[in-house]
Structures are given as C-alpha cells and as structure tokens.
Amino acid sequence: MLYQAASEAAQKRWTTSDFDIGKPLGRGKFGHVYLAREKRSDHIVALKVLFKAQLQQSQVEHQLRREVEIQSHLRHPNILRLYGYFYDQKRVYLILEYAVRGELYKELQKCKYFSERRAATYVASLARALIYCHGKHVIHRDIKPENLLIGAQGELKIADFGWSVHTFNRRRTMCGTLDYLPPEMVESVEHDASVDIWSLGILCYEFLYGVPPFEAREHSETYKRIVQVDLKFPPKPIVSSSAKDLISQMLVKESTQRLALHKLLEHPWIVQNADPSGLYRG
C-alpha cells in the first residue's frame, strides 16, 4: 500500500504529537488543511489531513502517491514545499509550506481582475517555475487559480501536484480543469509539456479579464470553443495590445507552435510589466 512504501522512504517518522495543530486553513474533497507548528523547531507549516477511506473510495491513491513523489523532490521559490508526510490508521498527513497570504483564487474573486503589472509578475514567476518543472520532466497539467497560493512576500506558489506527471514521453489521459484544457486533451490525442503553456495562457487571460476565454454555458460549447481556439478579447476591462499578443501566441492549437516559456520571459509585455523580483507587493 502506498502509505507504507512512502513512510519507509521517509527519514523521520512523524506523528501528530510532533505538532501543535491550530486553525483550519481550508477544506478539500478528501480532508482538511490546518495551520500547525512543529514543536521541536517552532516551524510553522500547513498540515494537510486526508482520509484514507475517501481516497480509496474515489480511487485516487495513485494520484496522491504521484503528488507526494513529485512535490517532495521539487525545490523552487514558486513551488510550495512538501517537507514530509506520515499516516495513521485512518488518515494521511502531508507537511506543507505555509503560504501566509492564502489562495490566489480568492484574491482574484475579490479584485475581479488584476492590473497588467500584477498579472505579468505572476505569469513570469509561473513560467520560471514551469521551466524548472519541465527540466525535471514534470508536467503539471492543472495550472489554474485554485491551485496557486500567495506567500508572505507576495510571491506566487504552485500548490497542487495531484494531476502532475513525471514523464519523458507523450501522454493521452484526460485530466485538469475544463476551462483550462488544451485542444489536444479535449480531443484525446497525445500531449506533452506544451499543455502547461496553454494553461498559462488561459491563466494570463483570466488574470486580465476575470474570466477564462472559452467559458460557455454548456460543457459541449466550451469544448467546441477550445478546439476551434475561439479567442475573443472583450472591450472591457481595457487590456494592452501587447498583453493580447502574448496570450494569442500561447493559445495556439498546434502545440509545437506555442510560445516557448523562455521566449515568454523575453516578450515585451513581460519585460515592461513584470517585477524582476517575482514579488507583487500591491
């Protein structure tokens, strides 16, 4: 079983008694996240508590194993750290970095949309994090506002690696979120790391307009708009032509023609708007 295999690989056997557990930070489909303090070091962490029964019922144990395997080996300022994990009879516990300023999704809802400076800073940070991931043969496959957190300095953190995959080849499985799916996944053809470029393009659009570009009332209509790349830029809010140019170069049906991430960092809109520190201070 994954929990035993995982724990034997861990150098330290943690238990709940190693932590002072504080307020809940959020809840998900399979459990809750709590603010916690590791007693010996006084280190503040986020403790993600998942219920085994629910994981087994939904047949997502393999997904959790993958998330743990991948995230525990990644070290990047824009990727949430997974420090370790442990389990008891009923639960699995993930010891995660605490992102003080919480979920980006809530921030976007509150603001409705972001300034170009803020959007560019976030997009550049994520491009750097994805370049790092792709260099380690990790495709994220589920970049969206709900999977991003904001750290104490205003830096963005990729938080959820549940759909990510360690790969050297092209894959065909359907995953990720409907509005963010690229044409090749909608059509169930092979895909590679360029799916993350598409998702980053969708995210950039949503940062600037407050909604994803191919949103429609019916799923079938969303699928159709994605496959046709039915990309429209509404008149409001006002967005620069340079930002639209970048988005248009990322949201290209032919995956090999999408703007490469290192080229994205050289795009005039990024160069002119993104804070080089990667921190958005407001």
From Swiss-Prot:
The Protein kinase domain, residue ranges: 19-270
Catalytic function, reaction form: L-seryl-[protein] + ATP = O-phospho-L-seryl-[protein] + ADP + H(+); L-threonyl-[protein] + ATP = O-phospho-L-threonyl-[protein] + ADP + H(+)
Catalytic residues as annotated in Swiss-Prot or TrEMBL: 142 (proton acceptor)
Entry keyword annotation includes Magnesium: no
Subcellular locations according to the entry: Nucleus membrane; Cytoplasm, Cytoskeleton, Spindle; Cytoplasm, Cytoskeleton, Spindle pole
Residues where Phosphothreonine is found: 173
One function term, GO molecular function aspect: histone H3S10 kinase activity
Binding site for ATP: 25-33, 48
UniProt keyword terms in alphabetical order: ATP-binding, Cytoplasm, Cytoskeleton, Kinase, Membrane, Nucleotide-binding, Nucleus, Phosphoprotein, Serine/threonine-protein kinase, Transferase
Record's keyword annotation contains Cytoplasm: yes
Modified residues (Phosphoserine): 164
PROSITE patterns in the cross-refs: PROTEIN_KINASE_ATP (PS00107), PROTEIN_KINASE_DOM (PS50011), PROTEIN_KINASE_ST (PS00108)
InterPro entries: Aur-like, Kinase-like_dom_sf, Prot_kinase_dom, Protein_kinase_ATP_BS, Ser/Thr_kinase_AS
Tissue-level expression: Abundant in roots, flowers and flower buds, low or absent in expanded leaves, stems and siliques.
Principal subcellular localization: nucleus
EC number from the UniProt entry: 2.7.11.1
Family as reported in the entry's similarity comment: Belongs to the protein kinase superfamily. Ser/Thr protein kinase family. Aurora subfamily.
Function as written in the Swiss-Prot or TrEMBL entry: Phosphorylates specifically 'Ser-10' of histone H3 in vitro. Associates with cytoskeletal structures that are necessary for cytokinesis and with the microtubule spindle. Might colocalize with gamma-tubulin and function in microtubule organizing centers (MTOCs).
Cross-referenced PANTHER family: SERINE/THREONINE-PROTEIN KINASE IAL-RELATED (PTHR24350)
Protein name per its UniProtKB record: Serine/threonine-protein kinase Aurora-2
Organism: Arabidopsis thaliana (Mouse-ear cress)
Lineage: Eukaryota, Viridiplantae, Streptophyta, Embryophyta, Tracheophyta
